[in-house]
Amino acid sequence: MRVPGPLRPFLAALVAPLLFVPGPLRSDTGASKTAPGKEPIRWRSIASGNSEAKRSGKPALYFFTAAWCGPCRLLEGQVFAVPEMAAQIERDFVPIEVADRARETGRNSPEMLALADRYGLRGFPTLVVSRPGLAENLMLEGWQGREKALEFLKTAKKRFLGLEKKPR
């Protein structure tokens, strides 16, 4: 079908945003929605995730994100939505979503603000890996591409898994 010349820009404006729909989409609860048969990441709240990290000794993977953050959707779609990566993250880390809700609710939770201050958050997305009892943490700021994110997770796994706890 041939589209008449004057309608082409209008049609392109309608279709172009559909090409960049991020995945996975999120529900109001923050749970990832993925296609059937795929293993989504079960993001924990700050409180339950911190508790689980302390109990299990696994490093916490903090995902600082916001609903309005386009680069956050790229990270979700190109890294977190990949079934193998989701399974690896669930196995090696305690994934904790730290969502900025200031635009939606007018404020952020005290827990979110405390973590943002603790790690010197400067923007979204930001990944921080920290293990309870260790003074050290690793941080990846901004969307730097799929390969950089995968490299970051691999480095964090090597650095934090199997380490003895050092007092803070």
Q: Locations of the language-model features?
A:
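Bacterial N-terminal signal peptides
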Residues: 12-22
